[in-house]
């Protein structure tokens, strides 16, 4: 798998704290504290374990509102989440993910990998990402 991945998180409106803006754990290496915690889609035990570890390790959590027009660019190793939207208005966001030419799907995708098959169709774990939905924007060219 590659670590050459970045996501642009683009809200379509202002996102106040009550709406659940994108939230980050800092520093970037914070993911290492929780990378072995097993994801559970049926309850909140995963979230509780993450919260407990970050508290014990004194990991800083950055939660700030987004103004209209602001964009977040974040690395795939940056531990992030979007808290619950406590308003009656939908939180509308476009997330575009970009990765290096030659990137591969991780060999063992998990529930936390999300619905990756929807976004990288016709590609199996361990294979180079190559599908009609994932065009090469800037190909790597062998240089002498």
Labelled PLM ranges:
Residues 15-79:
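Double-stranded beta-helix
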Residues 3, 13-16, 57, 70, ...:
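Residue-level signal for the start and early helices of compact helical domains
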Residues 39, 71-73, 77-144:
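Non-heme Fe(II)/2-oxoglutarate
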Residues 5-14, 41-51, 58-62, 106-116, ...:
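Low-complexity, flexible helical/coil segments
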Residues 5, 20, 91:
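Conserved catalytic motifs of the protein kinase core domain
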């Amino acid at each position: 798998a590659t670590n050459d991945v970045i996501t642009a998180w683009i809200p379509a409106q202002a996102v106040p704290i009550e709406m659940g803006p994108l939230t980050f754990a800092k520093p970037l290496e914070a993911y290492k504290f929780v990378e072995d915690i097993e994801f559970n889609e049926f309850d909140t035990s995963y979230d509780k374990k993450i919260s407990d570890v970050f508290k014990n390790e004194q990991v800083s959590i950055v939660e700030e509102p987004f103004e209209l027009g602001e964009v977040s660019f974040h690395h795939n190793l940056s531990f992030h989440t979007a808290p619950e939207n406590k308003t009656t208005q939908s939180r509308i966001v476009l997330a575009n993910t970009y990765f290096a030419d030659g990137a591969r799907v991780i060999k063992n995708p998990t529930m936390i990998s999300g619905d990756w098959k929807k976004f990288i169709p016709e590609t199996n774990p361990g294979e180079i990402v190559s599908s009609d939905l994932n065009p090469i924007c800037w190909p790597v060219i062998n240089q002498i």
